[in-house]
Amino acid sequence: MEFYASLKSIAMHVPSERVKNAEFQQFLDTSDEWIEKRTGIKERRFANDEEKSSDLGVIAAKQAIERAHLTPQDIDLVVVATLSPDFLAMPSTACVLSAKLGIENKPAFDISAACTGFIYLLSVAKAYVESGMYENVLIVGAEKTSSVLDFKDRGTCILFGDGAGACVIGRTKRLKESVLDVQISANGNFSNYLYTPRTLKPTPFNAKEEALEPFLRMKGNEVFKLAVKTLLKDVETILEKNALKPEDVRLFIPHQANFRIIQAVREHLDFKDEQVVLTVHKYGNTSAASIPMAMCEAYEEGRLKKGDLMLLDAFGGGLTWGSALVYFGGI
């Protein structure tokens, strides 16, 4: 191999509106204490009515491109992961975002892997770059999860927030600046654990109608148990495969879904507090955006430097899951 895929830059963006736990008390049987005790979340950000996922994503993307010392015209491929796309079926949010960046006549597509979206993005970008097909790949996790939440459902609406994270994946000849390894997986037999239903309308050829509300639904207890079990095994596998131990990792950056899930994995693998990056308390679960947002916060706080090894993991609807070992290669 002449070169490896490398994470050259990272950036993030969140809406300005902060929504604290206590605000849910106005319309739900809940409290600040109840939410924080069960999730670790204190507040989250919600986009306004005019903002879409692509609007959040494009701000992060512009900064990621600038931090990689590139222009939008240097980007060869744009891939977006989202569970809250701008449009129901088409065009893809990646196409919309590309246009907002001024990128024309370059491929762009979406990935649907829910909260595991960023790990899937890394896998795709690594494959394209290391095959030699593309040199600079822009990957974006962009979510307006508030657009798919049922604010009558206490089990879901308190968990999520809006935001975006973006990275440029380019080339390097140095292994210790590379996207070292990515593993992704899925099991559709559990698709009914976490899903967003689609409303069916009758047609002249089919009288069936399902008046299901198009909001995110989740079997919380089942998802929690499967997430902990699956992530523990997945993280152990990728470390063993690469002959690494937890102490070899500079930062452990898990998907920011729930503090209890993160804590269970952290304690089992004996990661030290200073190794773990946590943002769930102030952003909630931002789905495909949560890992790049957490990475960006670590970078901007001075905790992540060039050459540092990160361990990433995520679990989401599908069910999907994955993990990655990534050396920070840029900025």
From Swiss-Prot:
Gene behind this protein: fabH
Organism (species): Helicobacter pylori (strain J99 / ATCC 700824) (Campylobacter pylori J99)
Keywords: Acyltransferase, Cytoplasm, Fatty acid biosynthesis, Fatty acid metabolism, Lipid biosynthesis, Lipid metabolism, Multifunctional enzyme, Transferase
EC number of this enzyme: 2.3.1.180
Pathway stated in the Swiss-Prot or TrEMBL entry: Lipid metabolism; fatty acid biosynthesis
Protein's name according to its UniProt entry: Beta-ketoacyl-[acyl-carrier-protein] synthase III
Annotated spans, ACP-binding: 256-260
Any one of the GO BP annotations: secondary metabolite biosynthetic process
Subunit: Homodimer.
Catalysed conversion reaction: malonyl-[ACP] + acetyl-CoA + H(+) = 3-oxobutanoyl-[ACP] + CO2 + CoA
InterPro entries: ACP_syn_III_C, ACP_syn_III_N, FabH, Thiolase-like
